[in-house]
């Protein structure tokens, strides 16, 4: 069978110029020009993998699941456990009740049980996946219909793509210890570490994020997020914007919007909330802690 590698351009399936070790390959795949190797992976049907350096599963892979991150309180002990079925309601619940030790342990126990139940024994690439011009994929689960083009590194990630709502990972992106939900796109040099990206989100144009969560239909470009809880429909479009230690939803960040979670000399221990529908104007600076009402 021939594989369509780009619109109107077909190549016959097969394996050419590639080193594979302990790999299961599905039907009608085209794998060629693998610079280093593919090691210990499961590959589905009708995949196109070309000009990729390394695809590998190593010992201790988590695929981004069970990772505890500190959202809002950057210096905290961790209040959200990231896993593939996380949603904004559960994440907010974990943050709100992080001081309730018994409840926190119960939630973590339930999530750990789910992670153990659903964790694959090695990295896998689903069916109808396209991976081209990519440097490194390690300990990652890439589900059906995903397209990865020109990425630099995916490490300990789960990409929850499906054929009806595919995920696109674009050029120069680095994604580590993170989960990306269906319909999302991570493009143009975006950098994610210890993050959860919900459905139909776009992170692009060099946006960098660490220990943050983004939920449905959020758009982030150029700026930076750290320990941020970005609920549905948040938008930030400017290079000079920093979202740190804040809880947002239906929020629009103006250019040069900045937040400070260092009050006095105690370190980054402060945080605040902008309730739904908030908008910050250009040059806004907020010193946490604060709570700002809706709209």
Regions picked out by a protein language model, each given a short descriptive name:
Residues 1-122, 127-128, 295:
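Terminal amphipathic alpha-helical/low-complexity segments used for targeting or macromolecular assembly
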Residues 16, 21-22, 26-27, 32-33, ...:
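Left-handed beta-helix
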